[in-house]
A protein has these predicted regions:
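A structural motif
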Residues: 33-36, 89-92, 124, 146, ...
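Active-site groove signature of glycoside hydrolases
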Residues: 85-103
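Acidic (Asp/Glu)-rich catalytic clusters
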Residues: 52-61, 81-90, 140-144, 168-171
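Beta/alpha (TIM)-barrel catalytic core signal, keyed to glycine-rich beta->alpha loops juxtaposed to Asp/Glu
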Residues: 100-268, 274
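A short, structured active-site edge motif that brings together acidic residues
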Residues: 59-72, 94-98
């Protein structure tokens, strides 16, 4: 369960703003009841960590993220300890490097050593990275030992399957969390998009026809596309209220035939055949 909405207004289809504390409690109670055992947060998500600490998160595994390395290693470590304080816990299941570009910073090696010390001291169970592109995943696989990775993945974005990165991560026993399975809500609502998205109208229409033919809702299709991808260990979803989480949980038990998005034609899939 993502928690950015608990600390900030977030998402292209979020019309309600930041989630009220009482609703946060309802969401977490329902999540716990349904076996959702992991919360994803970050110091940069407004006051999300403080909200979670106030409500109580001892029944959940927590994934949080680093602050900017620009302020120095000591400050990043101090911010992590502040996260523990704000969350009202003594350790986290995972700490992700939030800005992947910082691996190129000359201070990064020093930070990574310090994080591994925190892991030895059992303040962190898994160290990992939040990524955005296949190239970043390739770079990490080539250069670092790590336990956990967060990647973008959805029915429109299967680059990590097509490029073999998901399989490579699994071969190294790295835990994979997928975010953006609803593409910030876009995959759930095509009716209220701004002009910026008009260039993809044809693709959106075609996708909606496919979903309609499957007799599933947009939510069911997008969610189960990710859930049926075996290389993914966890799917990260964010909600604004408990009813949305109820819808997601109720939509998560449907088997979906995923062949509808694969086009089995090598002359299309391999550019070497293009003329």
């Amino acid at each position: 369960l993502g928690t950015v909405q608990f600390g900030l207004d977030y998402g292209v289809t979020n019309h309600d703003g930041q989630v009220a504390i009482g609703e946060v409690k309802n969401i977490l109670d329902y999540a716990k009841d349904k076996g959702i055992d992991t919360l994803d947060t970050a110091p940069s998500y407004g006051n999300s960590e403080k909200v979670l600490g106030g409500v109580g998160v001892n029944d959940f595994q927590i994934i949080t993220k680093t602050t900017s390395l620009q302020v120095g290693v000591a400050n990043v470590l101090q911010a992590f300890h502040q996260s523990l304080t704000d969350l009202n816990i003594t350790s986290v299941d995972g700490l992700l490097i939030h800005n992947i570009e910082e691996v190129k910073d000359k201070q990064f090696d020093s930070l990574y050593k310090e994080l591994n010390k925190l892991k030895q001291d059992k303040l962190i169970n898994k160290i990992g990275f939040s990524t955005y592109t296949p190239d970043q995943v390739d770079f990490l696989l080539d250069n670092f030992d790590f336990d956990l990775i967060q990647v973008p993945f959805n029915v429109f974005d299967t680059r990590l399957i097509d490029g073999g990165q998901l399989q490579a991560l699994k071969n190294k026993n790295i835990e994979v969390h997928a975010r953006s399975v609803f593409l910030q809500g876009l995959l759930l609502d095509f009716k209220h998009l701004g002009d910026y998205f008009s260039k993809w109208t044809k693709e959106f229409d075609s996708y909606q026809e496919t979903v309609q033919d499957s007799e599933l809702s947009l939510l069911e299709y997008a969610l189960n596309f990710a859930l049926n991808t075996s290389e993914l260990d966890k799917i990260l979803v964010g909600v604004d209220n408990a009813n949305q989480l109820l819808d997601i949980v109720n939509s998560s038990t449907i088997g979906v035939n995923l062949n509808e998005f694969s086009i089995d034609d090598v002359s299309l899939l391999n550019p070497v055949y293009w003329r």
